[in-house]
From Swiss-Prot:
Protein name (database record): Succinate-semialdehyde dehydrogenase [NADP(+)]
GO molecular function: aldehyde dehydrogenase [NAD(P)+] activity; succinate-semialdehyde dehydrogenase (NAD+) activity; succinate-semialdehyde dehydrogenase (NADP+) activity
Purpose of the protein: Catalyzes the NADP(+)-dependent oxidation of succinate semialdehyde to succinate. It is believed to be the main source of succinate semialdehyde dehydrogenase activity in Mycobacterium.
Entry EC no(s): 1.2.1.79
Family listed: Belongs to the aldehyde dehydrogenase family.
Organism: Mycobacterium avium (strain 104)
Active site (catalytic residues): 232, 266
Lineage: superkingdom: Bacteria
Chain positions recorded as NADP(+) binding sites: 134-135, 158-161, 210-211, 233, 363
Disulfide-bond pairs as recorded: none
CDD domains for the chain: ALDH_SSADH1_GabD1 (cd07100)
Catalytic activity: succinate semialdehyde + NADP(+) + H2O = succinate + NADPH + 2 H(+)
Amino acid sequence: MPIATINPATGETVKTFTPASDAEVDAAIARAYERFLDYRHSTTFAQRAQWANATADLLEAEADEVAAMMTLEMGKTLKSAKAEALKCAKGFRYYAQNAEQLLADEPADAGKVGAARAYIRYQPLGVVLAVMPWNFPLWQAVRFAAPALMAGNVGILKHASNVPQSALYLADVITRGGFPEGCFQTLLVPSSAVERILRDPRVAAATLTGSEPAGQSVAAIAGDEIKPTVLELGGSDPFIVMPSADLDEAVKTAVTARVQNNGQSCIAAKRFIVHTDIYDTFVDKFVEQMKALKVGDPTDPATDVGPLATESGRDEIAKQVDDAVAAGATLRCGGKPLDGPGWFYPPTVVTDITKDMALYTEEVFGPVASMYRAADIDEAIEIANATTFGLGSNAWTNDAAEQQRFIDDIEAGQVFINGMTVSYPELGFGGVKRSGYGRELAGLGIRAFCNAKTVWIGSSKSGDAGGGSKVE
């Protein structure tokens, strides 16, 4: 895949970029490693916080310009692109304010371990490679960059090949915010370069957000090198609605949860599991609202759904829907790519889906909603968990017992009750099953790339350092 900005609304190639050479890659790794050796010791939390806040200031001041760039590169609506830029600023501010506290020494009961003092100290690992996707060109990378930099790590970003301008902008804005040269670099390289970078002994760890095959590849390399990783992979999130829910609010939120980011979000709701008593009403209302959405030019403020980011992505969801309908599923609306230039696919609703269909088993990365009828809460949870994925989940009910049941039994990294799954700097983010492992954001995210070092200090008179001959 070429490294290029291709406007998904027109299919026009706007700008192409020359990949970094092997020598340039080596120089970037060397620069990052040398910077880390100094940065981890010579900067304080207060200094890093000043730079993080300055970066946030720039993101806010340049939000309109940045939004236009993201919309051009991957087709998200201008309003959602601006919201993403502002969210990135919020992420930097969160870690500027909280990093020192989140990484403070954690005292242990020294007496119980025979020490004068004992605690856990969090220290940065070093150079972290980030392999990031195109769907949230800035936010996905900032979720790694802000905590990593505040912890004292440095970063190398290998971004998706179709968002090179976004990738270059992020490295530039972080440097303009005051972080020293080499703290955060973008390398415009193909996916084939990832293995070479990750195997370099100067690179300490990796984080990847992307497809399951990409995650498997990075995990295999990192495992061979014994390097820690965080993987945030695909999702096929359930959106469950029970009879006690506020039906109109649930429908409204469900539509937003499905078409956010033109339907291209790992945590978008994709499978709508509705109690049989309200199923028909819910589906009718949902279809009505999906039909009312405006599809078109993502720079038009009136547009609700823009194009898919890539032609192959558009073709893949079209095939998933076509195959399901051919196998007996019912198409309630949408279902055919729009005529004309660009990679547009309309909001689509499919019912009567069976277990042998790709819509049942695969992630659908576009504005396609799959509907399922559940007889009771047991069947709703069974359908929700009948997937290899476990990223986010949503459940709508005003029954306290049902809420607790969903919290306890849904197999996912996140459960949102009477809302839609959203990433917040203040909340840990990640999945289970084939949605990956490790966590981003909040305290979990900043500690993900730290060495949790156990410190045991005996008294100067102690002859039993570390507990002597006690069993490990």
